[in-house]
């Protein structure tokens, strides 16, 4: 994952997003739905209807970046549409991108013996 500068917030756009959208469509959604500035330097994350595709837009001060990740199996865990815009930490974003439940990360495997 790309390291984020200090002070950068990560916003999740709740609900489903049309994943055919690129920079213009997602930037417009940031402005109209999230009521945020897409050029603010914060990350804005969007999930498709099936839940296996995630897009992130970020303006780094030099230009706009668009990242996409599709899970080979499973779905990205996402807040309900009633939650509105949700902010998460950069650590939670790392969990989210790994397909881990970012709301309650838990170790799923423990070694049974050493050596």
What is the role of each PLM region?
Residues 1-115:
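Polybasic/polar functional segments that serve as interface/processing modules
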């Amino acid at each position: 994952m790309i390291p984020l500068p200090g002070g950068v917030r990560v916003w999740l756009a709740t609900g489903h997003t049309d994943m055919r959208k690129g920079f213009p469509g997602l930037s417009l959604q940031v402005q109209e739905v999230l009521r945020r500035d897409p050029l603010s330097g914060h990350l804005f994350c969007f999930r498709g209807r099936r839940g296996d595709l995630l897009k992130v837009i970020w303006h780094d001060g030099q230009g706009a970046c668009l990242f996409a990740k599709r899970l080979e199996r499973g779905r990205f865990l996402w807040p309900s549409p009633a939650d509105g815009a949700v902010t998460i930490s950069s650590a939670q974003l790392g969990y989210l991108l790994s397909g881990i439940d970012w709301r309650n990360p838990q170790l799923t495997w423990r070694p049974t013996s050493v050596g």
